[in-house]
From Swiss-Prot:
This is Late histone H2A.1. Keywords: Acetylation, Chromosome, DNA-binding, Isopeptide bond, Methylation, Nucleosome core, Nucleus, Phosphoprotein, Ubl conjugation. Coiled coil: none annotated. Belongs to the histone H2A family. The nucleosome is a histone octamer containing two molecules each of H2A, H2B, H3 and H4 assembled in one H3-H4 heterotetramer and two H2A-H2B heterodimers. The octamer wraps approximately 147 bp of DNA. The lineage of its organism: Eukaryota, Metazoa, Echinodermata, Eleutherozoa, Echinozoa. Its main location: nucleus. Residues 1-18 have a biased composition (Basic residues). It is found in: Nucleus; Chromosome. One of its GO terms (molecular function) is structural constituent of chromatin. InterPro entries: Histone-fold (IPR009072), Histone_H2A (IPR002119), Histone_H2A/H2B/H3 (IPR007125), Histone_H2A_C (IPR032454), Histone_H2A_CS (IPR032458). It comes from Psammechinus miliaris. It comes from the Eukaryota.
Length: 125
């Protein structure tokens, strides 16, 4: 047991845990945040990978819907209004982010039916 051997070859490059998991979100940073926060005395190796994957999925879902909202408004740049429309028009995301206020998001367009002008018989002729 001299401590030598079974080490890395000199030419090999280190792979990040994010690239090993096939993620864009930083697994190492999520692990550091989990350790730094008061979530538990120990953090397993799989927990930050799973959490990073969930965060990446939610981000991709919101950006997909916000991109659709931007395209519907003939815009090429996503603004907070598009994020608001995306989240509030999706039932599950609205439930998840129900207590969240998006700055500069505005409100959903909604006019009560009783406030709309009444349709008369003359208008239909």
């Amino acid at each position: 047991m001299s401590g030598r051997g079974k080490g890395k070859a000199k030419g090999t490059k280190s792979k990040t845990r994010s690239s090993r998991a096939g993620l864009q979100f930083p697994v190492g940073r999520v692990h550091r945040f989990l350790k730094k926060g008061n979530y538990g005395s120990r953090v397993g190796a799989g927990a930050p990978v799973y959490l990073a994957a969930v965060l990446e999925y939610l981000t991709a879902e919101i950006l997909e819907l916000a991109g659709n909202a931007a395209r519907d408004n003939k815009k090429s740049r996503i603004i907070p209004r598009h994020l608001q429309l995306a989240v509030r028009n999706d039932e599950e995301l609205n439930k998840l982010l129900g207590g969240v206020t998006i700055a500069q998001g505005g409100v959903l367009p909604n006019i009560q039916a009783v406030l709309l002008p009444k349709k008369t018989a003359k208008a239909s002729k």
